[in-house]
């Protein structure tokens, strides 16, 4: 919908969320597109671009995006999706990325989300059934967690959000494990489970616009 895309070359140096939706002019997909449009700047601030895809045609995409501008949902109104939506009538891209799931539909892409890093590597994937809309706080959290892990060489624990402790990598040798037990420290409960405090400010300074 924004012209021809050369992927991933056009997005070199940026994070990308590539997501598929089952069909234009469907209610759950409409709510998702409105939410993506309303929150697009939040992802842009994280140096993350958004690309949509379905196996509908270009003219269907254009008509639907124009119709969305007139709708209201969950306090969102007057939104204009500006991210590109791929016309994949041939299902070529959808098949390559595993977006067609026989258990769901042979003629619709499932709700898939691919998190792609600046090197063009797929770092995470989430699949949703046709009936379930995506959680956009979680999509943003995944991007922030991946970037935090890369910038600080750490891992992020369950339910992590910026400002919460992060996980230090597990020791790779018995000597390192023994050293951790000996040194201990406030964040180490055992040789394999050590956390580290990282303030929200320090994290956001490192991951915004990078």
Language model features with spans:
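Chalcogenol-based redox active-site neighborhoods
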Residues: 1-210
């Amino acid at each position: 919908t924004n012209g021809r895309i050369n992927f991933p070359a056009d997005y070199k140096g940026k994070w990308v969320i590539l997501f598929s939706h089952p069909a234009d002019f469907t209610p759950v997909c409409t709510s998702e597109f409105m939410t993506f449009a309303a929150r697009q700047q939040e992802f842009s601030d994280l140096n993350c671009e958004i690309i949509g895809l379905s196996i509908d045609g270009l003219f269907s995409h254009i008509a639907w995006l124009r119709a969305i501008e007139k709708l209201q949902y969950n306090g969102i109104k007057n939104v204009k999706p500006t991210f590109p939506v791929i016309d994949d009538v041939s299902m070529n891209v959808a098949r390559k990325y595993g977006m067609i799931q026989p258990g769901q539909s042979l003629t619709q892409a499932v709700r898939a989300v691919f998190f792609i890093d600046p090197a063009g590597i797929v770092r995470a994937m989430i699949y949703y059934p046709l009936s379930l809309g995506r959680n956009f706080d979680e999509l943003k959290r995944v991007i922030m967690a991946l970037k935090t892990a890369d910038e600080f060489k750490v891992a992020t624990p369950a339910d992590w959000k910026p400002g919460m402790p992060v996980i230090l990598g597990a020791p790779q040798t018995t000597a390192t494990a023994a050293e951790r037990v000996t040194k201990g420290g406030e964040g180490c409960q055992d040789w394999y489970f050590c956390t580290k405090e990282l303030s929200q400010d320090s994290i956001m300074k490192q991951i915004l616009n990078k």
